[in-house]
């Protein structure tokens, strides 16, 4: 009898807990759309272009210089003295390695800075989502890309976009 009473009370408690979970207010937000529509994103792109402009032009200059030396080697290599040809080949190899190192460092630095700025913007979006969810009384907010179906009335993307701007 005691076991039956315990099992029945456990079943009732389980039924009520499922009902309580269903009462959560859930909203959907499209973070990617907000990110694309922010004016701050375009400002960051221009800022990064200005920040890396000098290094990019230096890499272009190095590439042009390297290409001219390679063309000279291909064009005049057969008529050069062997010592001149060897020196030019060594110079081309050294410049090619230097260019590759600088290009790789440039790409890594650019990617790192891009991620830093992207994370700042995403942090602002996350803060705005928390504010809007708190104002409108939502318990759970899910990214629209992770949802197969949602009711359009539960989409808070425009409210979050207004909050971020």
Swiss-Prot record:
GO molecular-function term, one example from the UniProt record: unfolded protein binding
Subcellular location: Periplasm
Keyword Cell inner membrane included in the entry's annotation: no
Major location category of this protein: periplasm
One GO location term (cellular component): periplasmic space
Highest taxon, organism lineage: Bacteria
UniProt KW keywords: Chaperone, Periplasm, Signal
Start and end residues of each stretch annotated as Lipopolysaccharide binding: 102-113
Biological processes, Gene Ontology terms: chaperone-mediated protein folding; protein stabilization
Matching SUPFAM superfamilies: OmpH-like
Signal sequence region: 1-22
Similarity annotation: Belongs to the Skp family.
Subunit-structure text: Homotrimer.
Family annotation (NCBIfam families): PRK10780.1
Task performed by this protein: Molecular chaperone that interacts specifically with outer membrane proteins, thus maintaining the solubility of early folding intermediates during passage through the periplasm.
Protein name: Chaperone protein Skp
Higher taxonomy: Bacteria, Pseudomonadati, Pseudomonadota, Gammaproteobacteria, Enterobacterales
